[in-house]
């Protein structure tokens, strides 16, 4: 350990072990997944906390060898064992890009696009003093770089092949191979009643395919082939959202499918159910009529949905009449 700390010091990184880890130091070959909590502090007298993964409720997952935009994190986690807690003070040369990385991580934590605001700017332009990152603390750090302190707790180290990668960490080939596996896992979770988890799997599979599709010319044979793989996954995702009663999301996704494939029976049926749930009676009836036109064998199922819709409408009418009687009786 002493020689590791000495090498880090020569490179402008001071390491202080707070709690020893378990077992031997992993070899951290390319593809190893390191899961850790981090806290980032300024190194000035105030020592302000910039970011804390515990506050956000989700640890950082770093894949070794994937050229993460902040190479110093890969350097320091390579020196840690599972269960270890350590503090690293890193010279400014190692953390110049931290403001950009932190913005992306904050966007991810907030459920936003991690590339928001970065698509049309090169790295140099982003570092210009007049380019705001949308966070006052990151803007200040960008304009006046300083050494940063990282408190790291290494939670878990997983060797390549022992975990399922997140879509963003996969190569194109890995994404293509992963989609059928993720799809089947989503189906299994749905059958077992784990609807929210199934939706997350379908979402991941769609994300893989969308990423591949972005690299193809829209309307080209490869683009169409990928789109036809996306459609059944999106319909499965919509089924999960129907169960979760998130009807407007179902309306949006099914409409997007029908704008491209106007003979998709499942999209009409799911959209009809969503319309019925939000009291769009005429639109629901129109969609169910289209289902019967395209697939007469669906008649028993459609009839059941229409009867349920009519019963709900009658009940609502009776409730409205009772409410109005109450208003006018005073």
Curated annotation (Swiss-Prot):
GO terms for biological process: xenobiotic metabolic process. InterPro entries: AIP/AIPL1/TTC9, PPIase_AIP, PPIase_dom_sf, PPIase_FKBP_dom, TPR-like_helical_dom_sf, TPR_rpt. GO terms for cellular component: cytoplasm. Keywords: Cytoplasm, Phosphoprotein, Repeat, TPR repeat. One of its GO terms (molecular function) is peptidyl-prolyl cis-trans isomerase activity. TPR repeats lie at residues 179-212, 231-264, 265-298. The modification Phosphoserine is found at residue 43. Transmembrane segments: none annotated. It is found in: Cytoplasm. It comes from the Eukaryota. May play a positive role in AHR-mediated (aromatic hydrocarbon receptor) signaling, possibly by influencing its receptivity for ligand and/or its nuclear targeting. Interacts with RET in the pituitary gland; this interaction prevents the formation of the AIP-survivin complex. This is AH receptor-interacting protein. It comes from Bos taurus (Bovine).
